[in-house]
Amino acid sequence: MPQPSYADQINVEDSSDYEKDPKEYVDKEKGYFPHVITSHISKSSSQSHPDVSNAVLDETFSFMQEAKDLEPLTPKQDKRLRWKLYFTVLVMLMILDMMLYIDKATLSYSSILGLFEDTHINSNQYNDINTLFYVGFVIGQIPGHMLLQRFPVSKFVAASTALWTIIIFLHCAAYNFSGLMALRFFLGLVESSLLPTMEATIGMFFPHSEQALLQPFFYISCYGCNIPAGFIAYGVQYAKNTISPWKLFMIIVGGITFFLTIGLFFYYPDNTSTARFLTKKERLYTVDRVRRSNHSGIESKTFKKYQVIEALKDPVTWLFTFHVFCNQLSNNLAYQQNLLFTSLNVSDLNSTLVGVASAGYNCVSAIIATYMMSVIKNQSAFHGAIWYIPSIAGGIACVAMSWDHKIGELAAIIIASNFGIPFIISLGWTTASCAGYTKKLTRGVMFMIGYAIANIIGPQMWQSRDAPRYYPAWIVQIVIAWSVSPFVLLIIRWILVRRNKKRLALLEQNKEQYEKTWIETIDSSGNHVSGFYENSMLDLTDQENLSFIYPL
C-alpha cells in the first residue's frame, strides 16, 4: 500500500493551536511525528493490522483481536453487564475512596479525641501538620504517576494501601509535633496518586456517557466517610482502657485498611482485559463497549513525551488545574468542622454526631446531583456551577449571622460544606475530556498539583488569632473558591463546544475518513511495517484522533 502524501499527514508536535481547523495541522517538511502518522482514508483503503510496536498500540489491542466476530449485545445483556460492573468495579472504587478519605480525616477526629493533649500541639501547629500532608502529596505526583504507568495497576494500588496502613499504625507512636509532621508528610506521599488511579480505572470500564453519571458516587464515598468515621469516633470515647481514644481510633482505621489491602491485591484489575471478576467474554464486551463509545484507547505502558507536551500546551489542562486550585482553597473547612462545632459549645462527644449529620446532608446532595445529571445529560459545567450556590449561601450566613445563633451557625457550616460535588464532577471531566494515556496521566498530575497547592495554603487561612469567626478564611472561600470556580467551568465548556463544532462538521462530511490512522514503525524483529488502524485500537491523543468528541 502506498504511503499517504505529506499533505494528508498531521504533525502532532506542532499542533498546539487548538482553535485552528484540524485540517490545518500539516507540516510538509517534517511529514509526521516519529512512529505515528495520522491520515484520512477512504472505504477502499486496507484494513489490515500489521505487527507494530506496543509503543503505538493500546494495551488491550492483542486481547481485542479475539473479538473480531463478537456479536452485539442485546439491550438485556448490556444492562446485565453494566450492573455487574457497577457492583464490582464501582463498589470496589467507592470502598477504596471512602477509606482514602477516612485516613485523611483521622487527624480531624483525633483533634477532639485527645491528640492535642498527648502530643502537646496547638491549633496553628495542627494547621501546619495538615499543610505537610499536602507537601508530600505534591512531591509524590510525578514519581507516583511514573510508577503507575510502568507497573501493573493492581500491584501499585496494593503497595500504596499497604504503605499507608503502616503509616496509620505508626501514628500511635507519635508523641510530639515533629513526629506527626513526618508521618503526615509520608502519608500524603503514598496517597498522592491513588485518586487519579481510580479515575483511570473507571475510564477503563465505563464509556464517557456513563462516567459523568458515576462521578457523584465518588462524592458519596468521599463525604460519606464521615458517617462510619463519626460513629467509630463516638464509640471510642466510651472505651475504658489505658489507650488514648485517638490512638484507638487510628488502630481501628488501620485494621480496616489492612484488610482492604489484601482484597485489593487479589481483585483490583490492571485493566479491562485482566479483570478477574469478569468472564473472558464479559471482558471482551466491556473493552468493546468502551472503545466504540469513546473512539479512543484504554491504556498504554509506554511513556510518550509528545503527549506530555500536548497536555501542557492545552489550555483546558490549565483551566481544570485553576478550577481545582480555587475549589480546594475551601477544603480545609472539612478539617476545621469538628473544631468549629466545639467552639459553638457542642461537646466533643456530640460533635462527632453533628459530623455524621453533615455527612448525611452531603450524601443526599450527591444523590440529588446524580439524579439531575442522569436527567439532564452532557451538562457537567452547569451541574458543577449550580452546586456552588449552597456553599455561597452557607458561607455568607456564617459571616453575617450573630455568633449567638448557635444552631443557625451549625446549619450554615453544614450547608457550606457541599462544594465537593463540583470538585468530583471536574475530576471526572478532566480525564474524560482528553485521550492518550500519557496525556491523561499528565493532566491528572497537573490537576492533583493544583489540588495539593490549594490544600497547602488552605490550613494557613485558619489562624488562631482569627478565632472563633475566622472572617479571612470565610471571605477567601466565598469570593474565590465558590464564586470564581463556576465561571472557570463555564469557560472550559465554551472551549470544548467550539472544538466539537469543528469536529462534528468534519465527521458529517465523511466520518470514516477520520476513524482510522496510518502507522509506520519498527516491529520487534526490526522490520519496517505500516498500515491503517482503527483509532480505538491506538494510544492517540484527542488532538490526533479527530473522531474523538469532547464530553460536555
Curated annotation (Swiss-Prot):
It is found in: Membrane. This is Uncharacterized transporter PB10D8.01. The chain crosses the membrane at residues 83-103, 163-183, 185-205, 216-236, 248-268, 353-373, 381-401, 410-430, 444-464, 472-492. Its main location: membrane. Pfam families: MFS_1. Belongs to the major facilitator superfamily. Allantoate permease family. It is a multi-pass membrane protein. Gene3D superfamilies: MFS general substrate transporter like domains (1.20.1250.20). Residues 1-23 are annotated as: Disordered. GO terms for biological process: cysteine transmembrane transport; cysteine transport. One of its GO terms (molecular function) is cysteine transmembrane transporter activity. GO terms for cellular component: endoplasmic reticulum; membrane; plasma membrane. Keywords: Membrane, Transmembrane, Transmembrane helix, Transport. InterPro entries: MFS (IPR011701), MFS_trans_sf (IPR036259).
